[in-house]
């Protein structure tokens, strides 16, 4: 036995040393001596001397095993770099995860089955089969499909915590848990809770055609949050402004809210896609700027079909909670189960470019301050007003129809434009005053790819739900065939 332990220790040392010394030397060096940022709060990295003295105490605080032997000396540096203040702030953030055995959600007739191989692998198969036998047409867990909803709940939950308890709120015992129990219980997994998984699913079905058991994307999640906020004004958020396809915010829409009440609390939900297959490196500084803002309530996103909740960063790594850790549905200890000091780190290169950004504005003065902060952002754009004739609303997670007042004509008019269903159409002639494609940054969306830059839509089926509207979709990728030009009504009048 002793011989086996010795061999195991040697093997572990080799693996760790290989990763530390033979891997890339640039990223670890860049991570040294950097502050930790948590939703606008700054925590200096603790120096080695004070870190060594408090390492054991912090390990116990985090509920981790303490050892003064081999493993402690090997991994102690990373643990000791966390200050107690930083860990307490992390633990005080609200974190929602997968749940099991909650109040059943009925399966849609044309939706996925509650029983899947993925579910059997990731849970206790006996319990899963028992639940399926008891409720064969219901979902008792969101494992495998609810992670984006959970990170959306985390984003909304932290916004409500800041709104009701302040950014300096910390979990430090039963009294503090009692203070936040009111709004955290709004997220319990019951149909009665206004922000429960059940109500997210209902809103997703109505607004985004998402069936129970289907994975939500950032756009569907944003729409659900907005709808649930409007349906529950008692939450304290006066308005929720959503952009599902860009980081654009329109001043006239925001100022209209403040005209009614200068102290209005507004939640911005910005669905953005910061690259093609990976986040473009040019956005790093702007992402850090968003998480450094005192108005930030986090970012939901992460990896394809595997969402994470990002609440901060340190050096080149972004700090996140992982919702893919199942917990049983509980009522008595629900608030306590929504806190953890365990978090992960992710490099920008590992992140999926589709994400949902949350910003909480508390009054007109806060709005004016935040506008100055994002003036140089490469992600968020504060514009005077929305263009009336081309009001686009398209999602990143699915192809959705969008409407435009200037195109509300009978579908038969397509023939007059000289286009057919399925054609890629260059709309530059119709909307010459829209963003000039020649001015598009070569690193924005297209990265280093040299391509034909045109404003295009894809002509849809004219025999759809509303025959009085010309259905079209915004196409944000390269096309495989030439676009079809159309005559400009403006040119004809001239």
Swiss-Prot record:
Keyword Nucleus: yes
Keywords linked to the UniProt accession: Autophagy, Cytoplasm, Disulfide bond, Hydrolase, Isopeptide bond, Mitochondrion, Nucleus, Phosphoprotein, Protease, Protein transport, Thiol protease, Transport, Ubl conjugation pathway
Enzyme Commission code(s) on record: 3.4.22.-
Disulfide bonding pattern of the chain: 338-394
Complex and partners: Interacts with ATG8. Interacts with TUB1 and TUB2.
Domain description: The APEAR motif (ATG8-PE association region) plays a key role in ATG4 recruitment to autophagosomal membranes and ATG8 deconjugation. The LIR (LC3-interacting region act cooperatively) and APEAR motifs for the interaction with ATG8.
Protein name: Cysteine protease ATG4
